[in-house]
Amino acid sequence: MAKDIEASGPEAGEFSAKDYTDPPPAPLIDAEELTQWSLYRAVIAEFIATLLFLYITVATVIGYKHQTDASASGPDAACGGVGILGIAWAFGGMIFILVYCTAGISGGHINPAVTFGLFLARKVSLVRALLYIIAQCLGAICGVGLVKGFQSAYYVRYGGGANELSDGYSKGTGLAAEIIGTFVLVYTVFSATDPKRSARDSHVPVLAPLPIGFAVFMVHLATIPITGTGINPARSLGAAVIYNKDKAWDDQWIFWVGPLIGAAIAAAYHQYVLRASATKLGSYRSNA
């Protein structure tokens, strides 16, 4: 929440300085929220956004693998595919688009790790967080289901877009990659949606979705060779449910434990270091 303060003196009319106040912490359990249409509208928005996210991105992955398959035939076989760079752009670009579209309705989480991090920071209630995560997981399953329905000839052959630990990497390496990648994403979410920044940059509505989308893009470039890049438990679960192969399920815990740890670290770092909530613990004083 922000308020305008009119400038006075010779600079009046040229600009308005913006002050801001931090919103109050969300209640842990808000039963009254269950009676409000705005909650269910937000849950629907999260479901649809995650469905669209998984449909576009997994379809891109399947299409790329088909186009680069040396044994494939048909007109698509002559195409070199979008490459890892194109896959990263598909994930980052869709997050940018969907966060921009849904931020004013649900906050544009589209990711249980983001929701979990915001819950730990008391930005959303437990009720809202649980409903969001359920909607995100169901949306992801439906989105991947659409891909399988439209690309049934290629879906299973090319791995179903499922996240799996690549050969040559240990489970510890995969877990660390997911922790660090999710930390980058959730840290960016906190920074881009910080009340102080929002008050200053509210006249440019794309400034929050843009860095979040870029964070997803950059993390994919770094971690696609290791885990296929999860950083989103709903994305990993949706692909595993529809693909339903042992390898995808054996590695599934990496794509839940890693992102949730990364989100928790990012929430603590933002709240107690960058935003100086540590002053409540009496450790130091900040004018930030």
UniProtKB/Swiss-Prot annotation:
Residues 1-24 are annotated as: Disordered. Gene3D superfamilies: Glycerol uptake facilitator protein (1.20.1080.10). The keyword DNA-binding does not apply. Its main location: membrane. Expressed in the root growing zone at 5-6 mm from the root tip. It is found in: Cell membrane. It is a multi-pass membrane protein. GO terms for molecular function: water channel activity. One of its GO terms (cellular component) is plasma membrane. A motif (NPA 1) lies at residues 111-113. The chain crosses the membrane at residues 42-62, 79-99, 130-150, 172-192, 206-226, 254-274. Keywords: Cell membrane, Membrane, Repeat, Transmembrane, Transmembrane helix, Transport. A motif (NPA 2) lies at residues 232-234. Aquaporins contain two tandem repeats each containing three membrane-spanning domains and a pore-forming loop with the signature motif Asn-Pro-Ala (NPA). Belongs to the MIP/aquaporin (TC 1.A.8) family. PIP (TC 1.A.8.11) subfamily. Water channel required to facilitate the transport of water across cell membrane. Active as homomers. Increased activity when heteromerization with PIP1-2. Homomers. May interact with PIP1-2 to form heteromers. This is Aquaporin PIP2-4. It comes from Zea mays (Maize). The gene is PIP2-4.
